[in-house]
Structures are given as C-alpha cells and as structure tokens.
C-alpha cells in the first residue's frame, strides 16, 4: 500500500515525498563468464531479476520480447504494410534496429512485412534547434533498404517527403503553434499535441497504403499513459491506450506497440550494446522541459519514473492493469471526433458535477444563487452533441471558436 498519507500531498502533488533517485545498476565492464552460454566476455549485462549475460545473450533476450509480442497475439498479418514512427528517442531507435534485424534474417526467422519509416519533425512546436538532418540521413544509410520519410507536425500528410528530398527551410505555414498558444494549461497543450501527432500518423499511413503503425512505447510510457488517461477523463478507453493493438485510428489503420514488454533499463542496455545514437535526450518530449509539476502528464511521468527506479516490477503491474479495466463495448456506441475514444452513453454524475461547477463559475453571482438554472445549464452542455469526449471538450473550451482538427 502507498505510504504517503493525505497530509503529505501538497501543492507539488506529492513529488516532495518521492524517494531520491538511486544509482542505476547495469553493465559490468569487466571480464567474466556469461551465465547463459558460458562464453568469456569483456562486458556483462546484468538486468534486474536476471543473471549477468554477454552481449549476444542479452540481445537475443530483448529481440525475443519484440518478436514474441507480435507472434503470440498474431496481430501482424504476413506481408503487412507497416509504418514505423521514429522521433529520435532511444526507444524509437531500438524499435528501428529490432525491425531491421528481424527483416534481414534468413527466410525461416524473417519477419515478413514491408516496412517504411517516418520521422515527424516537431521542432517548430518545441521552439528549439532545427532537426539534425545529418544524423537522420546517417540512420537512413545504416538501415537500408528501409525507406525514410519526413513530415512536419501540424502539416498535412500531402507534405510528406522522402528523406533525401526534405529541406528544413521549405516548410508550409503551420497553424498548430497558434492553437497551442491559445491553450492556457500545459496539460491541455500536451494532450492536444499527442492527439494531433497520432492523427497525423494515421494520415501518413493511409497515404503510404500502410495498414499498421509501430509505436515505440515501452512499459514506463504505457504506465504513464494509463494513469494520465484516467485522470483526464478517458477511463473508458484507457485499455486501448496501453494495449498491444489499438484500432481507433482513422481509415482502419491499426496501431501496434511491440515494445510494451521492454523497460527503461533494457532500452538503455540495447542502445549501449548496438552503439545507437539517439537524436534527442530522454525526457525531452514536448512540455517536459517545464518541470515535473507543470502539467498532469509531467507529474505522472515523474511518479512512474520514481517507481521504475525503486520498485521496477510495479510499473509493469500498473500498465497491465489497463488490460482488465476495459469498458463494455457496444457496436452502436459513438466515438470522439478527435481522439476516437468511446463517448459516454449515459449522463455521468461526475461530469454533471464538473459542468455544474463550471457553469456557476462562468455565470457569476447572479446565476449561482439559482441552483436549478445552473444544473439545467450543466445538463444542456453534456447533452449537446458536439461529438467530443470530456477531455477533448475541455480542450475545445480553451480554444474557443477554433476547431480541434
């Protein structure tokens, strides 16, 4: 049970009560015998709950998790068209390397699919330095014959270009920055940023005739996503946010998460073993530079990161819980126009209370004295058929007259 009491939760969201990060355990840079194959190795890899093993045994272990996640569930048809989303993070490069390795094996062990790679350039949204085009071109050379494409976040899929033809100076006008600036809270901006990225992936996959998209989310990312989805009001679709297969994307495109069984330590070791060079640092996603308490997503990520450091097995338990809390599916149930989450079929008392509070705050003293009028206004808002879930409706309210899409 949690040892943090209610009195310990202050304005910082209990981050002050977190245990300080411990030093990571891992690579033993010393000669020794591999406990798996017995080969003398100059570098042993010691994962949590596993014996020290050589580089080849560790890579076999990590790559087996990737193949097993796809093979056990049989979610990837033979010769499927696959789009791999690369953002330059360590996780995305690990997935790229695993996919390339699986496709270069002999016929018996080969992963039979046709893969393409897309890099979503979001530097204009981050406001930082321009993307490292040279490093991306080096990736394209290393992982030939995979085709690499680049598209800017906020642009249409029609602006998709091959890596060799892409130029950072030739970019379409981007309206995403304008919409992000209108959102008051970083929580809303990060949520909207994530939904726009996912919708762009679906559009690119449709343009390239890809039926499946590979997303490089590991166990820590999925645990954070599960808790965040519930907190934002998307509990009804939280199971799909962490599932191996997510079928909510447009045009029937299916999103797969083949790295969901890997943890942060395994990713770090894989990067070292294969000498990969991530294009962005860990924790440099949109909005994370603002600090742990700047948004709900950042605070949740800090909480899960602390669990990963001190109680590694707990993180896997958290995200696997998502598989067991799926809502009952109804064929006629409508979905959100923005995030494709199922809409609430019944009037929720919780949402009614939220809208009631919002109506009182906006109306001022006059209407707040009339409880029936406030409750009636709250019900009207919930029953209004705008095609949005609660979380996306909150974003729409901050945007005003601008549309989400």
Swiss-Prot record:
Q: What's any GO biological process attached to this entry? A: protein urmylation
The annotated pathway is: tRNA modification; 5-methoxycarbonylmethyl-2-thiouridine-tRNA biosynthesis
Locations listed in the record: Cytoplasm
Quote one Gene Ontology molecular function term. sulfurtransferase activity
Q: Which UniProt keywords apply?
A: Cytoplasm, tRNA processing
| Cellular component, GO annotation | cytosol
Q: Which SUPFAM superfamilies match?
A: Adenine nucleotide alpha hydrolases-like
**Task of the protein:** Plays a central role in 2-thiolation of mcm(5)S(2)U at tRNA wobble positions of tRNA(Lys), tRNA(Glu) and tRNA(Gln). May act by forming a heterodimer with NCS6/CTU1 that ligates sulfur from thiocarboxylated URM1 onto the uridine of tRNAs at wobble position.
Q: Which HAMAP family does the entry mention?
A: CTU2
The entry sums up its family as follows:
Belongs to the CTU2/NCS2 family.
Mind telling me what this protein is named? Cytoplasmic tRNA 2-thiolation protein 2
| Naturally occurring in which organism (per UniProt) | Drosophila persimilis (Fruit fly)
